[in-house]
Swiss-Prot record:
GO terms for molecular function: 2,6-dihydroxypyridine 3-monooxygenase activity; FAD binding; flavin adenine dinucleotide binding; protein homodimerization activity. It comes from Paenarthrobacter nicotinovorans (Arthrobacter nicotinovorans). Pathway: Alkaloid degradation; nicotine degradation. Transmembrane segments: none annotated. InterPro entries: DHP_3-monooxygenase (IPR053212), DhpH_subs-bd (IPR054707), FAD-bd (IPR002938), FAD/NAD-bd_sf (IPR036188). This is 2,6-dihydroxypyridine 3-monooxygenase. Changing residue 323 to S: Does not cause structural disturbance.
């Protein structure tokens, strides 16, 4: 098998973009990554549940799972106001963080062909190449472009005009270091994934690795608020400069009124959850939104991950889906076969998986956000991707 001799550009340098670029480069493909951020990404240390697809590449490179994740033994379901235990099921999930996964991938890829401050503003293609134009006035050309630029994908918008649709709620995120809450609170959440159930929204909390392989883990939490689209959402997403932001308001940009409201609402929670909310040093808020496409292959431009199907986070496999898109697409390009036929097979399989996953997390949200029955251990709400067949490779024979 021989890889393509075409040059490939990856727009978006997060986890899926780096996974695709690394697998392509390892197979001898000429590949560059273009990232809109002015520096390598941080993800603010947010937590991720480990799925096989997410860590597949890192483990192949000899990275030890223990060095990038922490274990757990159960999933706990409690009333987030009273602390009443709703249920518990054994579970051996491992938890990691965005900075652990991204940092490992970025270190392997290196900075030489990872181009920062490259915000895509123009995209065109002909029968042989794709032309890209960036906001800094530079241009680039490749035989293929992989759009891996996330839920707010510029590539998808340029191709299809599709933007994410607000799901009706936001998530507040926070990460706590050892010592920022009392030991009893720390132990309450350690070694488990905890659902805090409410009639109007829900919380989750779980441990994640320390920064840069520090021995002591951190605690990660999310609190999902239902917020009506319109004035209420606009106020929440308007930063201290008076600018209405579309996706996230980071801690140093939060309007003080909104931060006070976050803390005020946190006062009503069961003590362990309350202490997470009140002691998080850098909470921030992000809208939850969906987007989907009917095609991932658009001539010489290909969409993967959240740039193709943007799911809600409730089944803990959005990153895994993105990495699976990246891995299977890289395999299409690095095998000697009918490329167009194999791309069609790849697209069919990945769309089937992406659409099934999106439907699953919407059903989970309909219960979690509105006080519906969320039975402990219900397999319909299990973490992970739907099972679909591997894409077939179409040969020329």
């Amino acid at each position: 098998m021989s890889p393509t001799t075409d040059r490939i550009a990856v727009v978006g340098g997060s986890i899926s973009g780096l996974t695709a670029a690394l697998m392509l480069r390892d197979a001898g493909v000429d590949v560059d990554v273009y990232e809109r951020s002015p520096q390598p990404l941080s993800g603010f240390g947010t937590g991720i549940v480990v799925q096989p697809e997410l860590v597949h590449y890192l483990l192949e490179q000899g990275v030890e799972l223990d060095s990038i994740s922490v274990p757990s033994s159960s999933m706990e379901y409690v009333d987030a106001l009273t602390g009443e235990r709703v249920g518990s099921v054994p579970a051996d999930w491992r938890f990691t963080s965005y900075d652990s996964i991204y940092g490992g991938l970025y270190e392997l890829f290196g900075p030489e062909r990872y181009h920062t401050s490259k915000c895509l503003v123009g995209l065109s293609q002909d029968s042989e190449t794709v032309q890209m134009r960036f906001s800094d006035g530079t241009k680039a050309e490749a035989n293929w472009v992989i759009g891996a630029d996330g839920g707010a994908s510029v590539v998808r918008k340029r191709l299809l005009g599709i933007e994410p649709t607000y799901a009706g709620y936001v998530t507040w995120r926070g990460v706590l270091q050892p010592g920022e809450v009392a030991d009893d609170v720390w132990n309450y959440f350690n070694d488990k994934f905890t659902y805090g159930l409410l009639d109007d929204g829900h919380l989750i909390a779980y441990p994640i690795p320390g920064r840069e392989n520090a021995e002591s883990p951190r605690l990660n939490f999310q609190w999902y608020w239902n917020v009506a689209e319109g004035p209420d959402l606009d106020e929440l997403m308007t930063d201290v400069r008076g600018i209405r932001l579309p996706t996230s308001v980071h801690n140093n940009s939060l309007n003080p009124h909104n931060l006070r409201q976050f803390h005020s609402k946190g006062e009503s929670l069961f003590k362990p959850f309350r202490d997470l909310v009140l002691n998080a040093s850098s909470p921030f808020v992000t809208v939850v939104a969906d987007a989907t496409v009917d095609r991932m292959v658009h001539g010489r431009v290909l969409l993967i991950g959240d740039a193709a199907v943007t799911p809600r986070p409730h089944a803990a496999a959005g990153g895994a889906k993105a990495c699976d898109d990246a891995r299977t697409l890289a395999e299409v390009f690095t095998k000697n076969h009918d490329l167009r036929g194999s791309l069609q097979s790849w697209e069919t399989r990945q769309l089937q998986q992406g659409h099934a996953y999106l439907n699953k997390v919407k059903k989970m949200a309909s219960r979690l956000q509105h006080g519906g029955s969320f039975e402990p251990g219900n397999p319909a709400f299990a973490f992970g991707l739907p099972k679909v067949d591997e894409p077939s490779v179409v040969t020329n024979s």
